[in-house]
Amino acid sequence: MVRAGGWAPQDEVLGETGCGTLRRQMKQHLAVSAIGNDRTGMVHDLTRVISDCGGSISESRMATLGNEFAMLVLVSGNWHSLAKLESELARLGESTGLTLHMKRTEPRAPRTELLPYSIDVVCLDQAGIVAGLSGFCASRGIDIAEVSTRCYPAAHTGAQMFAVQMIINVPKRLQLAHLREEFMDYCDAQNLDAILEPVKS
């Protein structure tokens, strides 16, 4: 039976359940952090669970930190896949001792008002290097997208060195020539060898 206006009773049912079905089929995202004692097979354990649940790794960062191994992973999948993954990862944490945190999220929208730049810094190891660089960026409204650091002995002297790599997003409102000059002045004052250049696409 069709009611006035061409509306049928089943349309209401299809509308309600259809929206729910559509939401479950749409790609969703889960951010996962995991840390545990470094051992062979950790990456396989985590990625196998993601794959078995129907998830797909969109982005990831993994590193050894002391005797620990840390992983940051952005997983995409439909509602059912991610709901299953949340349960399976909780089981994995209990069985392996991994400390896991999970949070539903959305991919970041394109930010056309920002220009990606890379920072490379090398210096003698000393306290406060990252704090100083991040403070320089924060005071100018510059977003830090990625940070990577490491310590290593200098090849000839054996002196302990410190290296920093950053990806920053510079607002287009800033004058790049002036920013570069300020940055180099800051690094000279701190005895940092530094490079600031656009990210090559």
Predicted regions and their residues:
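A conserved regulatory-domain signal marking ACT and ACT-like small-molecule sensing domains
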Residues: 22-201
